[in-house]
Amino acid sequence: MKNIAFAVALTISAAAAALPQTSVAQGRSLPTFEVDKNWPKVPAGMKIGDVSSVAIDAQGNAWLLSRPRTLKGDDKAHAAPPITIFDPNGNYIRGWGGDGQGYQWPEREHGITIDYKGNVWLGGNSCPTNGLPGLRPVADDQLLKFTPDGKFLLQIGKSNQSKGNADTANLHRPADVQIDQQTDELFVADGYGNHRVAVFDANTGKFKRMWGAFGNKPLDADSCAVISYKEFKEPGPQQFSIVHAIRVSKDGMVYVADRENRRVQEFDRNGKFIKQLMKGDAIFARDLAFSPDQQFLYVGYNKGIAIVDPKTMEYLGQIQPPGILGAGHHIQTDQKGNIYIAQTGAGMQRLLFKGMK
């Protein structure tokens, strides 16, 4: 194997390989990182489409979810499968995914998660009227569950079947999921078409509960249009816009990234609103990831990653790698504290944890 570019060129300059800047909260040490310019190592001849999401398994392997339909020209003949797996050293292990019997693969891949049992969850965010090249006019209203080797286990919802936020049988363009190990519940950031958190039994797919921003009842809106607001002042709108990411902490708190409203909201497991952090000066809350000890919550912010105290929801500082982070879409951490960044349109990046400073 050797390093090659993704289908969309991934170039890292000497500056990008330097230590990313971390703003430091006064009197408190924060994590520092270094760009890993040799990760991942894509096999020669393999072309990977836009990488929309990344998940890390118990062995430290990185699972990339990409969009093969974004490849153009001759690259299509060398397309990698939608899921590609790389070991901690960046070496390619295997790949799988795509249409199959008994399930509906998403038209536009969006989010991937590995649960504590090793099962793989994924969904998409295609909209019938998005007009994107190479996509059929369908809505991704489903989530899929597989074993690590790609055996189909469960589908929640069906393509093109959503009846809106009150629908308990279908999702509507879900962006992200998280499994709560203590309750075996599936928390869904639902998402692009709906504007809610939806909770299901992770084994049976049975619907359990849902809520909107501040714990309100979620309301329907144009399911293919982004609800955007011109002003970003506390407390913000009473409804979610795009519910783009969700994380459940070890102590049972649920953190929700409300991307277009530029805020992260915290709830208990039953949807009781606790508090929020809003940053109106730039795009905020693209995605969420905990440090391994959950002392820090990393939040996609502008062209970097915000460091937040999940207990107080206080903004502590920012990780700002030079160069290539502008298209950061999803982030994840591994057991060593490294950060993985899926950059739609610009491949992947790994930041190596270098200690506290």
Give residue spans per PLM region:
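Conserved beta-strand positions in repeat-built beta-propeller and related beta-rich domains
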Residues: 64-67, 122-126, 180, 188-191, ...
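Beta-rich, blade/repeat-based domains predominating
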Residues: 45-58, 101-118, 128, 161-185, ...
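Blade-level signature of beta-propeller repeat domains, shared across WD40, Kelch, NHL, RCC1
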Residues: 325-357
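Blade-loop segments of beta-propeller domains
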Residues: 52, 69-119, 125, 160-162
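A short loop-to-beta-strand structural motif that recurs across blades of beta-propeller domains
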Residues: 80-84, 141-144, 195-199, 263-265, ...
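A short helix->beta-strand "capping" segment at the edge of beta-propeller domains
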Residues: 26-47, 230
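Beta-strand-rich domains and repeat architectures in extracellular enzymes and scaffolds
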Residues: 37-79, 244
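Short loop/turn segments that connect beta-strands within beta-propeller blades
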Residues: 87-91, 147-151, 201-204, 268-272, ...
